[in-house]
């Protein structure tokens, strides 16, 4: 069952028609900045993949992908993508991208096992991007520089929206604050991972939390990550404080991708060394794919944030429990 946060005295500043205009305004402006800041080319991407390819994102390892049988191929199963994290790296090679060049695409996914709430939906829409880097640039400096480029696009978008709409005030700080998961755990040793994220994000306004997926000194990871795309020592989430809901809102997840050594180590830690036999993972181990950095940026979350909406269902179409839909409507939250 979804947990619904009802902000006190909430009222959307935009009706349904004007909300659609606002969504397009946010997406068009931010996308143009992202392309320019990261040197990206838009490409077509798959909605589904062959599960035998190892190309789908296993996320935290327990989410079930949506699959279906293809009649023409004797009901051979295909899986709807959960993200394009692995496919993008493969595409950079196949499409002939050079050092410093990257791609981006609109990624639509179905997360059937998602626990829904104000910011989570079973429908996921994001800009998925990936860029070729040199092996010597697989370091925290490259990660931080890229985070700053993405954050710069976010800030400029907020400034633009504040000009377009009188009710929107700028709340993002000038600079984003960087911290590792271990530093965060040391700062708040008695709190849960989500509580730590909330405290640091509310204090700083915008935070980049780095090194996600590996176990901390207390034996627990800050958050889950699949072992075969991000290098757990070189990845990050961008979170901003969202006063409408009084939460830390994750807008983007990114990372420098695994090389041969990182992949072997992380598959061992995750207890899934059998994945090394899949085609995509074999290509990494055989050093056939380029070194890359990439990530995903939530389209609906960005629209929700910049339009100051209380629920992600105000900016995307999905299916919600009927009682949640009724309660939301009773409090001025119009779900699409």
PLM segments and residue spans:
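A generic secondary-structure signal for well-formed alpha-helical elements
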Residues: 34-41, 150-161, 310
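A translation/RNA-centric and nucleic-acid-associated enzymatic feature enriched
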Residues: 110, 180-336
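Extended, charged alpha-beta segments that form solvent-exposed binding/catalytic grooves
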Residues: 105-193
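A general structural signal for short secondary-structure junctions and capping/turn motifs
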Residues: 68-71, 93-99, 119-121, 169, ...
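Extracellular structured ligand-interaction cores
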Residues: 101-103, 124-128, 204-206, 246-248
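N-terminal pre-domains immediately preceding structured catalytic cores
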Residues: 50-61, 170-179, 321
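Class II aminoacyl-tRNA synthetase-like tRNA-binding/catalytic domains
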Residues: 2-120, 128-132
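Generic recognition of stable, solvent-exposed alpha-helical segments in well-folded globular domains
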Residues: 21-25, 29, 138-145, 149, ...
């Amino acid at each position: 069952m979804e947990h619904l946060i009802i902000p006190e005295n909430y009222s959307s500043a935009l009706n349904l028609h004007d909300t659609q205009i606002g969504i397009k305004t946010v997406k068009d402006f931010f996308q143009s900045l992202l392309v320019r800041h990261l040197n990206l080319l838009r490409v077509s991407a798959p909605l589904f993949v062959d599960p035998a390819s190892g190309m789908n994102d296993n996320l935290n390892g327990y989410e079930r992908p949506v699959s279906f049988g293809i009649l023409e191929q004797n009901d051979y199963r295909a899986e709807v993508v959960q993200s394009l994290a692995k496919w993008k790296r493969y595409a950079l090679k196949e499409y002939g991208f050079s050092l410093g060049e990257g791609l981006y695409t609109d990624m639509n996914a179905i997360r059937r096992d998602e626990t829904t709430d104000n910011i989570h939906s079973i429908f996921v829409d994001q800009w998925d991007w990936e860029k070729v880097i040199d092996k010597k640039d697989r370091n925290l400096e490259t990660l931080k520089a890229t985070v700053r480029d993405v954050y710069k696009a976010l800030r400029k978008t907020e400034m633009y929206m504040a000009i377009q709409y009188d009710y929107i005030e700028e709340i993002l700080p000038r600079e984003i604050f960087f911290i590792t998961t271990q530093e965060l755990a040391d700062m708040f040793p008695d709190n849960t991972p989500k509580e730590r994220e909330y405290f640091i994000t509310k204090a700083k306004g915008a935070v980049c939390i780095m090194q996600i997926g590996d176990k901390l000194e207390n034996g627990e990871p800050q958050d889950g990550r699949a072992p075969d795309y991000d290098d757990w020592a070189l990845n990050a989430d961008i979170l901003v404080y969202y006063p409408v809901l009084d939460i830390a809102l994750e807008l983007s997840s990114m990372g420098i991708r695994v090389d041969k050594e990182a992949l072997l180590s992380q598959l061992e830690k995750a207890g899934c060394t059998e994945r090394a036999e899949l085609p995509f993972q074999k290509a990494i181990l055989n050093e056939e794919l380029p070194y890359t950095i990439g990530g995903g940026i939530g389209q609906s979350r960005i629209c929700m944030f910049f339009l100051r909406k209380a629920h992600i269902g105000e900016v995307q179409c999905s299916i919600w429990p009927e009682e949640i839909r009724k309660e939301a409507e009773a409090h001025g939250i119009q779900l699409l």
